[in-house]
Amino acid sequence: GAPPADSSSASERFTKSVIDLNLVAPLVFSQLARKAMVDKGNDGLIINISSVSGMRANPMGVAYGAAKSGLLNATETLALEWGPQIRVVSVTAGLILTEDSRAFYGDDESVSQIAETIPMRRLGNPEDIANACLFVASEASSWMTGTNIVVHGGGEKPSYLSATTAFEGS
């Protein structure tokens, strides 16, 4: 993750650190993991953890969103380059409730209001992401590579829906 930062005033150092942590580090790790798997003669799997921030606008988080978007592209590219021996899959997390995220989402009332914008009416929890990773690591997903599993409870309600009356009573 990354703390919120206004894109007009975030420092170059901050921006680079967010991109290094969320894009460069996973790429370097993937290269090292691939080498270790190939050197041992093993097929393998690399699971990247991305964020819905890489799939939509991310106010106060442009560097984080850009890095996660880049990670999604890297997943597809590495799968193409390294297949069939190495599979590469992304698991993209929606709004996940953790101790750290509470500082970003606010108090319990704010969390409840945010949850109402999600079709499943709750924020995800770390186990939701872990379960998706377990599926990706299982034999049931052996033909999956270069893809992105989005775990977001159905997404977030588009903001214009709060302003329209077109769907009242639906």
Where would I find each of the regions flagged by the language model?
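C-terminal helical subdomain
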Residues: 90, 109-140, 144, 151-153
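Alpha-helical segment proximal to the catalytic Tyr-Lys
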Residues: 35, 79-84, 142
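Residue(s) in the substrate-gating loop at a strand-loop-helix junction
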Residues: 51
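Active-site helix of classical SDR
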Residues: 30, 67, 75
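Short C-terminal tail/terminal secondary-structure segment
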Residues: 56, 134, 145-170
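Substrate-binding pocket helix/loop in short-chain dehydrogenase/reductase
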Residues: 3-19, 110, 114
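Active-site loop immediately N-terminal to the catalytic Tyr-X3-Lys motif
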Residues: 56-62, 121, 139
